[in-house]
């Protein structure tokens, strides 16, 4: 494994009840043509995406992004692994959605990767003609759903995945990334 890139779209419930109430309140205010006063997120979250989910350091990285990099390196026992992580605040109540790109040192086999993930406990791969969603599939489930497993357009060593989970039932974004551990160790 040479590189991991993760873009995680986090729901407002990642901020607890306050986040859920904030999205509901902002949505009602906007739909009733009332002025909006952001409280929890510092900006409008209703019908909007925010480019960060928490405070950023001097280099512009959020705490959650740095934690994901550190924990994934430790989990994989690859302390020098190049990892890029971006966390986005999405205007959804529940369910995490991740775009994950993995680059290995040799050509990837998307079908073998898909089969390996599908065999992993707590992971369900949705066939290539469909894809899972956080609301339609993952909500209320303890399963991590993986879809759109495919090799990169320009680089046959690259594999791209779409991963969704119920953040309340299954845990944080790191748990979704951990589901790819078998794939990384066995096939990249």
Protein language model features and the residues they cover:
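C-terminal active-site/capping subdomain that shapes the small-molecule cofactor and substrate pocket
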Residues: 80-188
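Active-site-lining helix/loop region of Rossmann-like oxidoreductase modules
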Residues: 1-115
